[in-house]
Amino acid sequence: MTPYQVTIVKYGTRRTVRSDVYLNYHLYGEPDGPIGMDYFFWVVRNADRTIVVDTGFSATGGANRKRTTLIEPAAAFDSLGVDRAAGPPVVVTHAHYDHIGNLGLFPDSPLHIAAAEYDFWTGPYATRTLVHHSVEDDEIDHLRRASRDGRLRTFENAVELAPGIRVLRIGGHTPGQSVVSVDTTDGVVLLASDAVHYYEEYERNMPFTQVANLIDMYDGFERLRAMRPDHLVAGHDPDTLARFTPVGTGTLAGLAATIGEEC
């Protein structure tokens, strides 16, 4: 098996406060204060294949929530040389607006999503206020169309997309929240997506404010620790890019980092 290189792309950002991102923050007895939140998607590739992990928020989804766009995802994918027309597989870690907003950029791609995630967002509770605010209806409809067209690939608990790339359902944040494990030249990389928004969340067992099942989220932290990856990539932490090899030139300079050598 040829190992992969992972590229982390920061396409958006916002500023908020700690009590807005940590569940029941007042219980920790700590002062509130400012915190950043960055928005990422990921590209996994070697000489044989390219796999896209999430697609970022759309212009509409970002504007509806006053998020700042740093680079349009389409431009970022093109800068990386991702052949969108070739239909590379797309992993949907979960169906929130900031992860599936640009599925239309990949009209021929198979979409891989946990069955629990798809079932929830097409089920009877998806319109309830406390969960619905995190999605865009037309983007959920895109998943429905992909299912009708035969492009949606659901899995129960785990699936190997290719040698060295595994997707595992963790739950917690959403019913089908998934993570992606990738074998690279620099060891095993775990793309935690929103199973871990912030490194502090993971290290201090401080769940994010948006949670479908709190106990599953706590259990998810333990499951990720048990996996003992060489590198864990959080889903929204502003410190993420600084932990890895920066992309220093071109359109993505300062907005991307890599793990592993180009293969």
Task: Give, region by region, the residue ranges found by the protein language model.
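Active-site metal-binding motif and surrounding structural segment of the metallo-beta-lactamase
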Residues: 67-113
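Active-site neighborhood of phospho(di)ester-bond hydrolases with catalytic His/Asp-centered motifs
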Residues: 52-55, 87-94, 113-114, 169-172, ...
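Conserved beta-strand hairpin/beta-sheet module of binuclear metal-dependent hydrolase folds
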Residues: 13-76, 179-193
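Metallo-beta-lactamase
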Residues: 71-86, 116-169, 212-229
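Core dinuclear metal-dependent hydrolase active-site scaffold
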Residues: 8, 42-45, 51, 156-185
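Active-site environment of divalent metal-dependent phosphoester hydrolases
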Residues: 15-17, 59-60, 95-101, 175-177, ...
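Short, electropositive alpha-helical surface patch
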Residues: 61, 70-76, 107-115, 168-172, ...
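Cap/insert and terminal regions of metallo-dependent hydrolase folds
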Residues: 67, 183-263
